[in-house]
């Protein structure tokens, strides 16, 4: 599960 998916910019 992607935990830092919000940092995938």
Swiss-Prot record:
Tell me which UniProt keywords the record has, alphabetically: Amidation, Neuropeptide, Secreted
The UniProt entry's GO biological process terms, in alphabetical order, are:
neuropeptide signaling pathway
Membrane-spanning segments: none
Q: Which residues carry this modification: Phenylalanine amide?
A: 9
Q: Which residues form the signal peptide?
A: none
Point out the coiled-coil segments of this chain. none
Task: Give an example GO cellular component term for this record.
Answer: extracellular region
Give the family this protein belongs to, as stated in its UniProt record.
Belongs to the FARP (FMRFamide related peptide) family.
Name of the molecule in the record: FMRFamide-6
Q: Which organism is it from?
A: Sarcophaga bullata (Grey flesh fly)
């Amino acid at each position: 599960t992607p935990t830092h998916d919000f940092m995938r910019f």
